[in-house]
Amino acid sequence: MSIIPTTFNEHAISYALAGGKNFKREENDVGAVIMSRGGWYNFPSIIKSLLDIGCTSIISVESPKKSIDLDNMIHEYPFVKFLLPQEKTTIGETINISISELKTNYVIVLWNDQSILDSKQLSKAIAEAKSLDKMCLSPVAITKTNDLISVQMLPILKQGHFSTEAIPIIQNNTRSIYAFDFAGIYTCNTFIDFGGFDYTITNPYWQNLDFGFRTFLWGEEIVINTHFKVKYLSMLPVEDTSHDDSYTRFYIKNLRPTVANGKAYMKFDVFFSYMKGMGFNPFMAYNYFKVGYDWVKKNQKRFTVPPYDLISNWREM
């Protein structure tokens, strides 16, 4: 049973960095992480948009499965560092690594199949990120056919079952329980202090939601900024919301802690309902429960709101 990380980037993986001869690392700078999913056709456009806003600390995360002309890319983009994982990693884990390498105050996370619609508006979003000091400002997004994507995510309970609902964004800096597709402007000090993404949760949907839920449980916020707009140039990613192993980890960490008198704790009777609800045998249920129990105890003073209060009062907050 993997132990839930309690510190940022706790899980060390093997990776290589290539290029970056003119890479600038300045603490007050805004860095960028370009995640790899589509082809290279949009890469020059993203780089131009980032340079237009003065971003010269850029990491491009490459897929081990994708063949690229690395020598040519290093020569053409000397201010970009190319991060090459040497083993299988989760999306969140590569973001953790990239943020630790950048060492900037703010980091823009994008995918290489996303186009930044307006660099000047992105500059406004960055200025708001600095003044608001939220965990993350996530972008408004449209499809390749210019249809608005519902990127505002609400936590909901239906007949006692937790899920999320996507609705269109209509107001600037509206809260969202997670940043759609991991994209956004992250405040790095807060991100690191909160532990980043949990590498033990391998399903991207639950990993992203785990980070977002923890953000709100611990008193911070993720909001959608209408100045920051991206366009998808390929098909939208499909979110896998199935109740898999990642869900069981998300559930015990985020939905079952009791919060009272300024701290969180796990009631032991949660074990029995957890075992029944997940269909586990006692041994397996105890292993999962113990990992969650220890993690909640370790972070008990960081919780600021009970999980179900957060959900039920979401629209009023």
Region roles according to the model:
Residues M1-K48:
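N-proximal low-complexity "stem/linker" segments adjacent to membrane-targeting elements
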Residues L50-L84:
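Acidic donor-binding segment of Leloir-type glycosyltransferases
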Residues P85-L102:
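Glycine-rich, basic loop-to-helix element that forms the pyrophosphate-binding segment
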Residues N105-S115:
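Short beta-strand-to-loop acidic/aromatic patch adjacent to the donor-nucleotide binding site
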Residues L137-M153:
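Short beta-strand-to-loop element that shapes/binds the nucleotide-sugar donor at the catalytic cleft/hinge
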Residues Y178-A179, A183-G184, T190, F194, ...:
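A short, conserved alpha-helix in the catalytic core of glycosyltransferases
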Residues I222-M317:
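Active-site-adjacent helix/loop segment of glycosyltransferases
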